């Protein structure tokens, strides 16, 4: 499933090295420019927010959580279509993320094709 026409960055924020690497490889395999960050703080310090077309973020991370990152970006009027991924989500967390503007909320492990479809939707939003 190639996703064409995107030149803006897809940012991956996850504290798990293997997950970051796998997601970055998946996105690059379909022709999408992806950059991985080990924490929300690292992403914010990178200055890449305005160049980011889609954010894939873990919910639970040391330091700033994915939900806190989304709230900070929203407060700075930086609305990035966000896909949350988590190994430990619940219905309340899902609703909180979606109400704050998330495009999708996915439980790990997830199907690669479902994630890529969510990225496509995010890029079109």
What are these regions (language model features)?
Residues 17-35:
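Two-component/phosphorelay signaling modules centered on CheY-like receiver
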Residues 58, 86:
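Active-site residues of response regulator receiver
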Residues 61:
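Receiver (REC) domain active-site loop signature in two-component systems and cognate sites
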Residues 108:
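A Lys-centered signature of the CheY-like receiver
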